[in-house]
Amino acid sequence: MKTKLFKTKKYTAMRKYLYILFALCMFLSSFGVWGQPNNTPVSLRWNNGGQAVKGDFIQIGNIRNFSTDAQSSATLKVPTHSSCLRVKWAGLYWSAYVPIGDRHDSRIEQVKFKMPGDTQFRDLRADVHMYSNFANSGDSYNCFKDVTSLLQSKGANFNNGEYTVSGIYSPNTIGSWGGWTLIVVYEDIQAATSKKIYIYDGAEWNFFNYNGTQTKTIPITGFQTPPAPAAIKARMGIFTGAGDRGTGYTSADEIRINEVKQGQNSNPNAYDDFMDESITYNHSEVAMPRNPNTRNHIDIDIFDIPNPGNTVINNGDTSLTIKFVASDAYITYTVALSVDAIAPLLI
């Protein structure tokens, strides 16, 4: 004898809820990571709780080496003669382009890391995984790992040494890029001034089409520069992907601080072609030792912001703006900024 299943009102309502749940799941899967938009906006990662640092930051990095399991290295050298340095904060980022089908691949969040004096790599897993999709053609991810304690364990030997990253996941497909950067905030008790330091990260395309020039502005607040007649100094570092050198989209590819263009007259980091696949320190590729020393659509640039007569950042300023202006698409992974600031006297 067969049992007949009666479709009660309760059963019908449950089936309706299941349909709604299924539709919601399909909607969420059209985003990046579940519940996360396809574009992870660049936002504040670290600013020392708003307190000034008697020191500054330094940034190094390199491309993903497609020929040797993505292994590449760069040399960190703090631009000071002080012998009294210590690590305040350090963050490692690795980023790459992957096909859409690989957006949830667990290998994305894993790399190998080697510091000065190490004889073996150590395995790292990302603390945060950010990513963005461009025109449904592929994904670009950005992974962050706090490595402060690792660098602090080196003492003063964190400086003047080679750092190596291996295993950045990215299939060898046409148009692929990948790379890593290490941002280190250091304290220097011999420093003449204190600085407010801001570290931003994300995975944010500056735009999603090629319909003219578009902009992205990051406001920086919460500091106060010293009073006159002090000369105000500031430093900026960036890590971006998908940049091109001289591709025809260079009529507007700029970084502006308080609306003043940054860069120089020619590549690398030309005023109108800043995102040009260069890895530089103060617009010099020679000043950023790395292996291999090649280009692959990755920009890692750290530079002191020219401020003649305090015409860009003035005495007593409490805010500034960083503006990205471009008619070529690129993705911003990290932005770092330091600026002279008044620090309270600690008794």
Show where each model-derived region lies:
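Bacterial Sec-dependent N-terminal signal peptides
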Residues: 1-37
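Short, intrinsically disordered, charge-balanced linker/junction segments flanking boundaries
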Residues: 6, 345-347
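Disulfide-rich extracellular domains of secreted proteins
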Residues: 34-344
